Amino acid sequence: MSSFEELVRECDRLWLNCRCTRLRLTPVKKQVQKENRRKAVELKADWETFLQHAADNLEDAGWKTEMDRRVLALLRSESVLNFAVLKPAVQEEFLSITKQFVRDAMCFDTALELDDIMQAMRNVWIILLLECMLERKLCYHKAIFAYSMLYPYTDNFLDDPAIDRQRKKVFNSWLSERLKGEQRPMDADLYRQVDALVSMIEDTFPRQQFPDVYDALLRIQEGQILSVQQDSRLCEEEIRRISIYKGGASVLADGY
């Protein structure tokens, strides 16, 4: 298999060779855009109201039925997934795993916002789609949950312009060491939550048996550190390479 750096260079070449390719994107009228935004705002508000007291209703039969209906409607409306083309049995598995992920997320952190859950859930869906493409049975375990949940915790912290660079640097240094297997307790909720998620991955994929899993996670972290530097001082070539590096490492981890 090609090295990761070779794959990054190959993707860069492919991107440059596609510059003259015309995308067949249908224009969306302003009125339709406005209507779509309105629907998105209403959908988000509706879900937030529904999830507000979710922790107290997870075992309630009526709540579970309503959750089934909502998740199924969400899957069917998601244009990227193209859910309707999946076989009925696969649709059922998709639905079951999505519901379980939402329950797990709410149990893990009752303070999670809907945006955070959706951000992590998209990664779960990507993993499930990869399994479909590889014609494998869909599976869900705590490492998939934990890896997906790392995104809202780490990305949102590092992308927050209100947090100074020094705090981000300290966190990145700690996370890099944690992904290498170092245990250095920190007295802050963010660190404890991320540490718990990494521990879940370690429980499912022991380091000695699955070194490639942690190599991929470290690649993502390296890309994240580089992306913090992604500002006006970087040229287009550097920005493109960082984007390919980070995105490629994420898909590689999904595959593992």
What kind of feature is each model-predicted range?
Residues 1-96, 129-180, 256:
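Acidic, metal/ion-handling microdomains and their immediate structural contexts
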Residues 85-150, 156-172, 178-256:
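All-alpha helical catalytic cores of prenyl diphosphate-utilizing isoprenoid enzymes
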